[in-house]
């Protein structure tokens, strides 16, 4: 028996647009999709789903009980809205991991620890930071089958990891420099440059440990790089025993969420 869903997207415009595209391509039977404006959209910003315009609602005027699922991409300042939505009976997908540190909220990497979804105490499911998700996909089998003495992760972060404003800023700086126009000396240079990310890594390590308690010694290094989309990572694993690489290769090949390609 199929079930038609009412779904709300709560995010900035660019992310709402991407989420709507992804849901349209999914196998979910969505009867109605709505957008709750985390920040007010401009007049020309509209979302379409299945060739129809999507209803847009102000955040403070939303009746959360209208929805079955809410994809919420707010920060900690929006936590009260997230809690209200969960208390209204809908399942909240916490896309930015605001509730990831709460003991009674599962932190899920799809296909890796789905068993944590069996009991939902708060109607909230948190997703890890993208750095953590990508790292967990890359080492899941190693983590399950080996004792790792040290794990080092270097993440090369694109502009889109921060927000759409940073993407536009990188595009503007790139065009400016290619046209021979120097940047303002007081301006943080993004184009044709790399620099350490100021974001704290403590929460990243804590999220990894919540998913894999045996990985309590993960160290993240973050580098902001001049690319628009796509995050790369370099991972170093240390163990007193020899690794079985084939087990991890088989895990990648068997996972529909991993696009595994052998080096040519």
Language-model-derived ranges and their functions:
Residues 1-188, 214-218:
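N-terminal Rossmann-like NAD(P) cofactor-binding subdomain of oxidoreductases
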Residues 4-5, 70, 160-264:
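Charged docking surfaces used in two-component/phosphorelay signaling
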